[in-house]
Amino acid sequence: MWIVLALVSVGCSDASELVPPEHVFDPCAPLAIAGVDANAAELASIADASQLWGDVGISGPLETGAGDSVGVAFGAAAPGVFGFYDDAAAIIHVSDALTAGQRAIVIAHELGHAFGLVHVTGRGSVMNAGNLTIVPTDEDRGDVAALWGDCADR
């Protein structure tokens, strides 16, 4: 399953060719992010990913008591695959071969997909395919606001 999905996760498509995901979440609304059989370090990476979005004003992820939830599972992946968002099941899969910082960025990237964002080229973005270093930027926040409105206005 990883190999088939890896082909989707590492390739970029023209946005006009993308099929809307089944599970897209309002990033300004409460959203529980739960580690699936995650250890303490993996849970910390989930919290760090939520904080990365919080640093640019996206406030929803990791609030307790949320009606909606996204799972995060960690495990082995094909070489060169860092993670993917299984929108049919609302689960983010993350390679367990990554460092803590890389895991947080990959989770933040996959949360971007859960918010409805697609891969970005031409500028530094958490939504760059294969990204392991760029955290969510103000431009990424702007992309979220273009889809959902500005969280600060709610």
PLM segments and residue spans:
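Zinc-dependent metalloendopeptidases
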Residues: 12-154
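Sec-dependent bacterial lipoprotein signal peptides
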Residues: 1-10
